[in-house]
């Protein structure tokens, strides 16, 4: 459930990843644009399977660059959270950040190496090494949830128990004053900026 910000503007928090579903219902396709008519023919089925496999392979290879960037953003945000919580210099925190960075670099290296070891197919397409591509994709997919967990851990659980934004601005019963007082963990950071980081 998305709650619109009422006091602290955060335009980037309103941007999300969008996937699409394309439905061809009662759609005319000119015959010269039909490439796989005759599914009962053995060669067509084999070609269709290979086409799907190569499409997935290309996607997995692109993943080694895409998810690396996501991991770098998570590492940066986790480092910011650690600074706001005044724990950035703790060895266990540095270890956690190093784990995220290490995974990102290994995934990127797998993608680069798979491109370096690519083969040119008769069609002219340069196809990345399958083993290295799959290794990078698996490493990224396996560790991304650990990275989210690390970031949540570094917040000290505040990301799960942060009061609604309105509470930080309530005047009755000093609710806002108390929320702003107890959210601060590092005296170098204001209550508002701490709130912004934790809400991010």
Question: Where are the language model's segments positioned?
Answer:
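Short, charged, amphipathic alpha-helical segments
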Residues: 94-98, 126-134
């Amino acid at each position: 459930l998305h709650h619109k910000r009422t006091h602290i503007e955060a335009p980037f928090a309103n941007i999300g990843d969008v996937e699409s579903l394309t439905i061809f219902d009662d759609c005319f396709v000119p015959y010269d644009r039909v490439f796989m008519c005759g599914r009962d023919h053995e060669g067509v089925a084999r070609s269709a399977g290979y086409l799907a496999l190569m499409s997935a392979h290309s996607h997995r290879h692109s993943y080694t660059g895409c998810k690396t960037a996501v991991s770098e953003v998570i590492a940066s945000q986790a480092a910011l959270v650690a600074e706001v919580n005044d724990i950035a210099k703790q060895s266990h925190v540095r270890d956690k950040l190093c784990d995220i960075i290490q995974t990102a670099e290994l995934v990127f290296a797998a993608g680069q190496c798979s491109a370096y070891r690519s083969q040119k197919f008769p069609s002219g397409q340069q196809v990345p090494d399958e083993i290295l591509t799959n290794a990078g994709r698996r490493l990224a997919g396996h560790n991304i949830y650990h990275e989210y967990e690390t970031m949540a851990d570094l917040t000290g659980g505040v990301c799960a128990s942060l009061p609604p934004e309105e509470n930080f601005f309530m005047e009755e019963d000093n609710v806002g004053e108390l929320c702003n007082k107890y959210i601060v963990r590092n005296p170098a950071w204001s209550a508002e900026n701490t709130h912004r980081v934790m809400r991010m």
